[in-house]
Amino acid sequence: MLDPNNRPGGDNLILTAKSADKVQFFDAATLVLTGEIAMPGSTHEMVRSADSAKVYASVYGGGIFGKNKDPDRRIAVIDLATKSLQRTIDVGGNFAPHSVMMDEGGTLWATAELANAVLAIDPSTSKVERIEIGGAPHWIAISHETGKLFASFKTRDAVAVLDLEQRKRVDLITTPHGAEGIAVSPDGWALFVCAHGRGEVHAFDTRTHALHQTLRIDGAPGEANQLRRVRVSPDGRYVCASSHVDNYAAVYDALTLDQLAGFPTLKAPMGFGFAADNEHAYLCCHDAAVTLEFALASGHVTRHFETAPGCEFVISY
C-alpha cells in the first residue's frame, strides 16, 4: 500500500540545510543544484502534502533538543512546481516544531517538544489543535492501518501512542535504552525505534505494542548516547538506520530483519531519502555538508553531492 508519508521517489530532490537556513533542490539524475530557498529560520524536517504539490517543513529555530535557542513557531509551506516558499503556518507558540507527518484525512501532525505535545494542523485553514502527551516528543510516525501516531521521547525510555481519531494518548511503550528516531513500515504493522544508549533498533508490533525483535547495528563503533535515525523504504523491502556519532549506517532486510550491509559515512549521518528506482537511497551527512547516494542491497556508496551547511532531511519527488 502507499504510505502518504513515504511515497515513491521521482526526478527531483528537496533537502533541508538547517545550519544555512536554506532548502535546496537537486536534479536526481545529475545531482546538480536546481534551486534554493532562503528560509525564515533553521528548517529541519519535511513531509509532502496530500496532493503532492507542496512540502510542509518544520522551522525549528536555533539550538538542539534540550538546548533550544530562540525556538521557532512556524511550519513552512513550499510549492514544488515553483520551488518557492508560499507561506508559513503559526503553530501557536514557540514550541520548536520538528517532526512532521500527514494522516490519511489530510491533517498535518507536528511535534511540539517545548509544550510536551503534538499538534494537529489543518493546512487549508491553519487551525492548530494542541494535544498534550506527557513528554517532549522529537519524532513522530503514523500507522494508517491502526490509526495511531507514535511519538518518541528523547529524555525517557518511552514512546507515546496517540489514537488519531480520538486525538488522545492511549498507551506508553517502554523502549530499552531510550528512544531516538522512529519509523513505521508502509503496511503500518511494524514500528521501528532507535535506541539512544546503544547501537540498536527495536521492532514493535503496532497493534499490540509488543517488542518483536532488537536489531544490532553491527560494524558501528558503538558509541553510547547519540542520535540515531531509522527509515523504511517506500516498497517495504529495506530498513535503514544511521548512527550519528559513530559515522555509520546499516541496511536490513525488512522481512527477515537480517542486516544486509553496514558502511562508514562522512561526519554526522542523519536523514534518509529513497530514489525512484527502489534500489538506491540518500543519506544526509550533516556536519560534512554532503549527501551520499548508496545501493540498498549492498550499502555501496555510488555517488555524493555537496550541500549547504547542515543537511538533515531529504525527499525524492
Residue ranges and their predicted role:
Residues 1-317:
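Predominantly soluble domains enriched in secretory-pathway, periplasmic, or organellar proteins
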